[in-house]
């Protein structure tokens, strides 16, 4: 294995050298986390979608004959995620490694790996029957609990795969909240004010408009509780916007 290829196994180096994308330290810490179970409790506009796209592409390219599945809370979010991934691929050398026609729901690479991008739906019908090595949930707290627990989680049983759950918190009676409070998951707390692209003036205006309680959920991501104390917790950095 050449040194150049070994370097590309680092997702941050891959992002910079192949995707022409330089993650901020905020995103780099998450991308380099080797944990198989990761949960990110985040405010709006903190770079969730971009980080998910980078993770999916890097995993697919560096792990032949695997399936990476991105599940979005809505069809519209799924389409936006697909556009983000296709933009990354089409603007880089990776465009030559795509086999067949690029579609919004699935992309196959020359190494036999797939990236599939689908909405959760109300009953998970479009997800059933998929076995995955990597599952990335975008706005997990908005997905039906029965879909997360009965359809998505079982996809990883046969592969002992990786699962990331990223979301703005929406309620305590959800799998996302229980996962956040589980000792088995690596945790990250991403309040919106960490994003340098979001001005303090805007946040103060939002606080006045939507009220303190909603502001704490939407921008401080406090519904899951205070930020955890584990060493993997991100407390700073400069994320890209979604």
Locations of regions flagged by a protein language model:
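Phosphate/NTP-binding elements of NTP-utilizing enzymes
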Residues: 1-242
């Amino acid at each position: 294995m050449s040194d150049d290829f070994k370097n590309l196994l680092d997702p941050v180096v891959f992002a910079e050298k192949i995707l022409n994308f330089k993650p901020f330290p905020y995103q780099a810490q998450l991308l380099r986390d080797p944990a198989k179970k990761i949960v990110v409790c985040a405010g709006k506009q903190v770079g969730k979608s971009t980080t998910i796209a980078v993770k999916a592409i890097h995993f697919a390219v560096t792990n032949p004959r695997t399936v990476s599945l991105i599940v979005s809370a809505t069809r519209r979010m799924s389409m936006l995620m697909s556009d983000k991934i296709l933009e990354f691929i089409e603007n880089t050398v990776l465009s030559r490694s795509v086999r067949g026609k690029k579609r919004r729901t699935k992309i196959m690479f020359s190494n036999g790996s797939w990236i599939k991008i689908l909405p959760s739906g109300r009953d998970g019908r479009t997800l059933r029957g998929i076995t995955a090595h990597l599952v990335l949930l975008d706005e997990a707290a908005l997905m039906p609990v029965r879909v997360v627990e009965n359809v998505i989680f079982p996809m990883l049983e046969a592969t002992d795969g990786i699962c990331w759950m990223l979301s703005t918190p929406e309620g305590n009676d959800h799998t996302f909240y229980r996962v956040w409070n589980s000792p088995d998951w690596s945790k990250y707390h991403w309040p919106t004010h960490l994003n340098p692209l979001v001005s303090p003036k805007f946040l103060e205006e939002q606080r006045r408009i939507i009220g303190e309680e909603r502001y704490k959920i939407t921008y401080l991501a406090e519904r899951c509780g205070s930020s955890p104390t584990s060493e993997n917790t991100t407390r700073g950095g400069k994320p890209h916007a979604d």
